[in-house]
Amino acid sequence: MAKPTVNINQAIRAREVRVVGADSEQLGIMSLQEALALAEARQLDLVEVSPTAVPPVCRIMDYGKFKYQQSKKLQEARKKQSHVQVKEVKLRPKTDEHDLMTKIKHVRRFIEEGNKAKVTLVFRGREITHLEFGSRALDRVAAELEDIAVVEFKPKMEGRSMFMIVAPKVKK
């Protein structure tokens, strides 16, 4: 991903620019030379903030400080992002009651942590002829978790396995 380039000082190619001061005060439209002289008198940089405007908008500011603040904002935004993982729990069509409840507890824990959960039911051998056992088991899991989770992907066959994805309910 290419970083957007910002023109500063002599890199600005417009003849006339709209100048905004360091404190966001409008200084008006002036020639590039006048704007550069004004920025130099204040010992600051002339930074082109809106090159597509007519005339382009330039701000008088300390460019080094501006870059530092932009990088800090970017770091804060990255820090606030939450990474949702998809955890997987595998079942079999003949999984007994207690084992199924244990697997449901695992899925419940994943959902409470804010992650999505993929519940996979693996068919082996001739079990594939009884798909209704698999869909019943996945429906049971969905029913047990309906208080804290919503089914994002309905049960679906993929090869010799049937899966569904459950996600945490969105809090209002």
From Swiss-Prot:
Top-level taxon of the source organism:
Bacteria
Where does it primarily localize?
cytoplasm
**What's the gene?**
infC
Keyword field contains Protein biosynthesis: yes
For biological process, the GO terms are: ribosome disassembly
PANTHER family assigned to the protein according to its UniProt record, in alphabetical order: TRANSLATION INITIATION FACTOR IF-3, TRANSLATION INITIATION FACTOR IF-3, MITOCHONDRIAL
Matches recorded under NCBIfam families? infC
Role of this protein: IF-3 binds to the 30S ribosomal subunit and shifts the equilibrium between 70S ribosomes and their 50S and 30S subunits in favor of the free subunits, thus enhancing the availability of 30S subunits on which protein synthesis initiation begins.
Q: Does Membrane count among this protein's keywords? A: no
GO MF annotation terms:
ribosome binding; translation initiation factor activity
Q: List the disulfide bonds.
A: none
Family as reported in the entry's similarity comment: Belongs to the IF-3 family.
| Subcellular compartments | Cytoplasm
| Cellular component annotations (GO), alphabetically ordered | cytosol
**Could you tell me which Pfam families the record lists for this protein?**
IF3_C, IF3_N
Alphabetized UniProt keyword annotations: Cytoplasm, Initiation factor, Protein biosynthesis
Assembly, per entry: Monomer.
Where, by residue number, does the polypeptide cross the bilayer?
A: none
Which species does the entry assign this protein to? Geobacter sulfurreducens (strain ATCC 51573 / DSM 12127 / PCA)
Sorted alphabetically, which InterPro entries does this protein's record hold?
A: T_IF-3_C_sf (IPR036788), T_IF-3_N_sf (IPR036787), Translation_initiation_fac3_CS (IPR019813), Translation_initiation_fac_3 (IPR001288), Translation_initiation_fac_3_C (IPR019815), Translation_initiation_fac_3_N (IPR019814)
Name this polypeptide is given: Translation initiation factor IF-3
